[in-house]
Amino acid sequence: MPLFFSDNLRAALECLLFVAGGPVSVDSLAACLGVKPGDVDELAAELQELYAREERGLQIRAVAGGYQMCTRPEFASYCEALLRPELPALSRAALETLAIIAYRQPVTRTEMEYIRGVKVDGVLNTLISRGLVQEVGRKEAPGRPILYGTTPKFLEFFGLKDLKELPPLEDVAASQENSREAGGRGSIPGHPGEE
């Protein structure tokens, strides 16, 4: 792929993604760089191509409607050895509630409780405090209950570009059934384990 942009613009994009520490929207990057949003996509592709060609330890990923600089997965063990992160795990109840929100959003607390068969107040507050879920409006129904949906941090947490990358519900149900038949308790696909 031929390079169309100057080294300065690619370097500027690299700097912005480095200092951001998380996903940055295409519109924000375009405004900072003084280019069109489509140019940001091209710049990111060029930068990623350079990283791949030079076998760097970093990559540029499309995440949550923008771009993020992150380490390549094959070097994760080195990063873990240095940082020894203690990521707070989500309980099974939190994962179940989060799955309901992700697949049915916007959804009310009452709808979540109906599906789960138990109260979700504590779990919902945990998901909100971790920035994975947010209020997204009010339902046009008596009492105007609050509607909840996922956040860009949810996409980042699960490494998704957008909600379309969620596995189809049929695949999730089949995975749960296969796990139970094999004697397991079932788990959410893409999750390393449970609490």
From Swiss-Prot:
Alphabetical UniProt keywords: Cell cycle, Cell division, Chromosome partition, Cytoplasm
Presence of the UniProt keyword Translocase in the record: no
Entry annotated with the keyword Cell division: yes
Main location: cytoplasm
Gene Ontology annotations of biological process type: cell division; chromosome separation; DNA replication
NCBIfam families noted in UniProt: SMC-Scp complex subunit ScpB
Protein name: Segregation and condensation protein B
UniProt source species: Moorella thermoacetica (strain ATCC 39073 / JCM 9320)
Gene: scpB
